[in-house]
Swiss-Prot record:
Disulfide bond positions: none
Gene (UniProt): cutC
Record keywords: Cytoplasm
Molecular-function GO term, any one: copper ion binding
Pfam family, one: CutC
Organism: Glaesserella parasuis serovar 5 (strain SH0165)
Name of this chain's protein: PF03932 family protein CutC
Keyword flag Plastid: no
Amino acid sequence: MKVEICVDNLESVITANQFPIDRIELCSALAVGGLTPNLGFIQQAQQISTIPLALMIRPRAGDFLYSEDEIQIMLNDIATAKQLGIQAVVFGALSANGEIDLATTELLVKASQGMEITFHRAFDLCKDPITALEQLIDLGCHRILTSGQAATAFDGIPVIQQLVKQANGRIQVMAGCGVNADNVKQIIEQTKVPEIHFSAKGQRQSLMDSISSARMGTSSQDNVLDIADSQKIKGILKYISLL
């Protein structure tokens, strides 16, 4: 069983490195599903982490239908990842009708040669997951991240189970979204997934002495930071170790 944690700040990278985790998915803006992190964050994470890093390649929030300019941004970021020696990249691209964007994905896969490739939860928006899985196998992706096309991986157990059987080792199926200590054992036992993905999201108060009433965006929680919670990580890993 391989374990991946997704993080969007250096504090969480440091926390993750205290545990037997196999891979860290490095993102920014997990609140919108994860975007490509900035160069400074990537480089500092590389300095600190002994755990392999997977870099999110997603140029903006929203859907996964990308323009030519946005695709070029993704190619640029993949090239940067390769230059930095990043071990894996994570991306996904769809067509307007809810199918894998074959041409774009082929471009991204070719650009990513030498790194592991995860097709992220854009997969969960595909109208036909069975066909989509076969296409991603043919394109050369190494794994998919999926909640079984449901709101959470727990809710998507039946579909994930079907995908694992269909994959039959040709591609790794990694279950993610809403994975926690209360459901991880059941998800793994029922689906037989070889990999699990989670954020172990917690929060801590800002260490600033005082907080202005001014806000930096739409959130009213500028005085609270989302971080990977070490106790939640322990809880998840405890159940995985019993399997």
